[in-house]
Amino acid sequence: MHKIMAINAGSSSLKFQIFTMPGEEVLVKGLIERIGLPDAIFNMSFQNEKIKETRAINDHGKAVEILLEQLKAHQVINDLSEITGVGHRVAHGGEDFVTSCVVTDEVVKGIEAVTNLAPLHNPANIIGIKTFRELLPNAVSVAVFDTAFHQTIPQENFLYALPYELYEKHHIRKYGFHGTSHKYVAGKAAEVLEKPLEKLKIISCHLGNGASVCAIEAGKSVNTSMGFTPNAGLMMGTRSGTIDATIIPYLVDELGYSLDEVMHMMSNESGVLGVSGISSDFRDIEIAAKEGNSRALLTLRMFTGQICNYIGAYASAMNGCDALLFTAGVGENSPLIRQMVTEQLSYLGVTCHVTKNNAGDMIISNDNEAVKVCIIPTNEELMIARDVEKYAKQTIG
């Protein structure tokens, strides 16, 4: 038995879990928020105990130091050497990283080389990697790429209809994201349905503040809604999703926005927040919709309609669908969103049992339907830990 830590470093946050492997038991989990501010928040829960502290945490390096100190202070671990591996979620691996890998100096350079493809995500991921390598030098560090699962997407599905040399010389193409989540829920669905993953055609809907749809055939990603960046595809909490590209120069040339202002608008002021004018949180939107707010209702119709467009396209491309999956914060917790999606898909043989849906059952389609509709809670941290364990075993025997 050994202890594996899964890390998800954001620009001002650090999410963590420690698993005992191979039993996959969660030993501790937590979140450090508002890093860089004097009132940063440290959250940690283990056994029946929860800790929440507000304190100054200047940077990610200090956050990691405090985390390791707290783990020892509360006897979650007695010595840092007990942590045999650390897995890091990395948003973008470009075309070079097609699978998880042990972190070396060369790997760090490779991740840094594609930072321009994920400027909001990769820099924080790199800070997390460097800090843990410094403070836990004997632990195996593994990078787990959100883009890796989508490297099986065929060229006709990942290329943009731009001059081909832009792909050859500059690697401009669809990469896709949420790969770790889509991979996990597909495998879990196969277990739930008691069918071989290799025999299933699955459409996975990862619906949270970020959202994407993925077509999975025989356990491999064959298409996904996100693209060159995580801003493409569905409208999201604050992201516009895919729009007509010529809107951007129109905003700049005709309406006087700077390019930076447009990009900030598309990433931080659009999507659910932009359309509703209320919030980026679907819980707030659903409350407003029930109260009759027309823009909240419009937001729900737009979001679910876009999801259905992708589902229909992917079911057609795969010549069928055996399972439709809902996962992540909205997908797992919003009966209304699931209902609005499924009621538009009757032509595919999709059904939604009202009682099962409202109860959050794992299978919410009517009995004996060909297309199984499932709620599968995602567990990206466990997927990261599993990847780390493979490499840790090779190192520690």
Swiss-Prot record:
One of its GO terms (cellular component) is cytoplasm. One of its GO terms (biological process) is acetate metabolic process. Substrate binds at R89. The active site is at D146 (proton donor/acceptor). Mg(2+). Can also accept Mn(2+). Mg(2+) binds at N8, E380. Keywords: ATP-binding, Cytoplasm, Kinase, Magnesium, Metal-binding, Nucleotide-binding, Transferase. Its main location: cytoplasm. Its EC number is 2.7.2.1. Coiled coil: none annotated. It is found in: Cytoplasm. The record marks H178, R239 as: Transition state stabilizer. Pathway: Metabolic intermediate biosynthesis; acetyl-CoA biosynthesis; acetyl-CoA from acetate: step 1/2. It catalyses: acetate + ATP = acetyl phosphate + ADP. It holds the Pfam family Acetate_kinase. Its cofactor is Mg(2+); Mn(2+). InterPro entries: Ac/propionate_kinase, Aliphatic_acid_kin_short-chain, Aliphatic_acid_kinase_CS, ATPase_NBD. It is an enzyme of class 2 (transferase). ATP binds at K15, H206, L207, G208, N209, G210, D281, F282, R283, G329, V330, G331, E332, N333. GO terms for molecular function: acetate kinase activity; ATP binding; magnesium ion binding. Homodimer. Catalyzes the formation of acetyl phosphate from acetate and ATP. Can also catalyze the reverse reaction. PANTHER family: ACETATE KINASE, ACETATE KINASE-RELATED. Belongs to the acetokinase family. This is Acetate kinase 2.
